[in-house]
């Protein structure tokens, strides 16, 4: 009696393994450097001028930095970090499609953010955000104008 054992090695499946890429291949187990990442030029740190109208119709002006980075495994998705100069306490997610910045309705750290649209122009972004505060539900209207100061490469 002769036993022959034949094992099959799994063939490497080459493709894009970066889930943020337009051409992500979930079945690929070996990256072939073919990944196509969009909106890379929009990622980075922005110096922001923030004019905010509070519930009493008073306007406040603030200057601070906002970081725009990729949202996990969503080729159009982004996260805006430090909106309102609140660090990681207020992170707003959205999408970039062409020059458009699309922010869906969402909750972030108790803040209710209403759906809105903004846009990018060269190295700047512009967006108006309406939100309600966590405890009292006070309405605020925020106009953000950001100019890129640092690129993020990813």
What does each model-identified segment do?
Residues 40-63:
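Tryptophan-anchored aromatic micro-motifs
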Residues 45-47, 65, 77-79, 117, ...:
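Beta-strand secondary-structure signal
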Residues 47-54, 83, 105-108, 126-134:
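Generic short beta-strand segments
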Residues 73-123:
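Contiguous, well-ordered beta-strand patches that form the walls/edges
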């Amino acid at each position: 009696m002769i036993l022959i054992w034949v094992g099959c090695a799994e063939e490497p499946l080459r493709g894009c393994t970066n889930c943020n890429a337009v051409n992500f291949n979930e079945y690929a187990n070996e990256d072939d450097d073919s990944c196509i990442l969009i909106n890379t030029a929009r990622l980075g740190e922005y110096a922001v001028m923030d004019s905010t109208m509070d519930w009493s119709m008073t306007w406040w002006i603030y200057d601070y930095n906002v970081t725009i980075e990729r949202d996990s495994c969503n080729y159009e998705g982004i996260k805006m970090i430090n909106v309102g100069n609140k660090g990681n306490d207020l992170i707003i997610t959205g999408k970039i499609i062409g020059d458009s910045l699309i922010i869906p309705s969402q909750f972030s750290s108790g803040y209710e953010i209403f759906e809105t649209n903004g846009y990018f122009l060269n190295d700047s972004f512009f967006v108006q955000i309406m939100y309600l505060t966590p405890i009292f539900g006070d309405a605020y209207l925020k106009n953000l104008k950001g100019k890129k100061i640092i690129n993020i490469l990813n």
